[in-house]
């Protein structure tokens, strides 16, 4: 992806959930003698970064898919949760 495509994807994603913060972890910082920041992906709606990939896939494909298309996901974990959430966001049928 080009930098402009990354910026476009980030902007589109803000309609689904806010930017996840970087948070200084004082315990780990003290332990390792360096500032250690945690990227708080647990603050996304499905508690995982996997929603990002599902969102970008659907953002690209939904408009080109025939009406009534059912999407299928073979996962039982974080990706499945992101897939289901994004299906609902885009108003498409999904099967996990």
Feature names for model-found ranges:
Residues 1-96:
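PLP-dependent amino-acid enzyme catalytic core
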């Amino acid at each position: 992806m080009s930098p402009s495509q990354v910026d476009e994807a980030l902007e589109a994603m803000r309609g689904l959930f806010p930017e996840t913060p970087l948070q200084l972890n004082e315990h780990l910082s003290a332990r390792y003698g360096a500032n250690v920041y945690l990227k708080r992906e647990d603050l996304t709606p499905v508690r995982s970064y996997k929603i990002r990939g599902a969102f970008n896939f659907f953002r690209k494909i939904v408009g080109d898919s025939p009406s009534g298309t059912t999407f299928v996901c073979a996962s039982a974990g974080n990706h499945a949760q992101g897939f289901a959430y994004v299906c609902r966001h885009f108003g498409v049928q999904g099967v996990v």
